[in-house]
Design a protein with these regions (language model features):
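Surface-exposed, charge/polar-rich loops and edge strands
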Residues: 1-285, 289-304
């Protein structure tokens, strides 16, 4: 497959840079795969397309304030997006980052808005050391302070590049799903941003089961495809977990003839990747078995 085969025209004025005033009021286009019928509706009416006995799987990941603005010792500003731990076996003091501006191994970066007087006693340091340059705008950095804490206190939400605007205080709430629980994503599972508690309740009243899994959206969401042959594009790894109870509910619904719905591509690729483990029942979070993907999926490839 060639990249040019996927080229299409998308006017910038058709890209929503801001959320609707009221969550859940976006439009919804539905395709009936059996008869090809297309329905123009609204997201709030999504329950109309479900039946009693179906299950909807949601991604409960939570977007972190992963964008940090820093300065070098000479005062030059450098922007970092904290992506993931250097390795899934390491602590949270060493991370892979995407950076903007020139940096080199050994550089010291200082988090903007950090004041030793104001923040004394909260953080040991707000200094970040560049350990290694990886190429493609990526680097390994380290800090004496847990980088997640630095992000939480001094970071901003890393909005997707296509929005072409800076984050605002409103994005802390609206660029987050209403059911977000597990911190770790650098981007929201977009299809879920329109979901509301009221819509979820309407699904439950119709007899639809709700299940959860976690996939932390990572570097791949920001990295462009730079090769002409799509098969040569290297996907980046993403951390995911599927609880045993979710796997069991999926099996039950499937056995009873119900349908399994994945809300968004993050859920779809996780279920596709773990399909065999779910239906072979090797996914059992209560067993502590090393075949339990909810425990050993910390380094699974995101190429699903």
């Amino acid at each position: 497959m060639e990249l040019k085969d996927y080229t299409y025209e998308l006017p910038e004025n058709k890209i929503a840079a801001h959320p609707p005033k009221i969550r859940g009021t976006s439009r919804l286009l539905a395709l009936n795969r059996k008869n090809g019928e297309i329905t123009d509706s609204f997201y709030k009416n999504i329950a109309d397309f479900f039946e009693n006995g179906d299950i909807l799987i949601l991604n409960d990941t939570k977007v972190i304030k992963a964008r940090l603005f820093t300065t070098k010792e000479n005062g030059a500003e450098r922007e970092l997006i904290i992506l993931e731990r250097h390795s899934f076996d390491s602590d949270w003091h060493k991370h892979k980052v995407m950076y903007r501006g020139k940096i080199k191994a050994g550089d010291k970066l200082f988090v903007k808005n950090y004041s030793p007087d104001k923040n004394n006693g909260i953080f040991e340091s707000a200094e970040i050391t560049v350990e290694e340059i990886l190429g493609d705008g990526l680097a390994i950095v380290s800090s004496k302070t847990d980088l997640r804490e630095l992000c939480e206190n001094f970071g901003t939400v890393p909005l997707p590049p296509y929005m072409r605007r800076d984050a605002t205080p409103l994005d802390i709430e609206r660029y987050q799903t209403v059911f977000a629980e597990e911190k770790g994503s650098v981007a929201a599972p977009t299809a879920s941003l329109n979901m509301t508690d009221e819509i979820l309740e309407s699904l439950k009243k119709k007899g639809v089961k709700i299940g959860y899994l976690t996939l932390h959206v990572g570097l791949g969401t920001f990295m462009p495809i730079r090769v002409e042959k799509i098969e040569e594009h290297q996907m980046h790894k993403e951390y995911f977990e599927i609880p045993a109870e979710t796997a069991e509910e999926i099996r039950k619904v499937h056995q009873n003839g119900g349908r399994v719905f994945a809300l968004g591509t993050t859920v779809a690729r996780t279920l596709e990747y773990a399909h065999n483990a779910i239906f072979e029942k090797s996914l059992n979070g209560n067993s502590g078995n090393r075949e339990d993907l909810s425990k050993v999926s910390k380094n699974q490839n995101g190429d699903l």
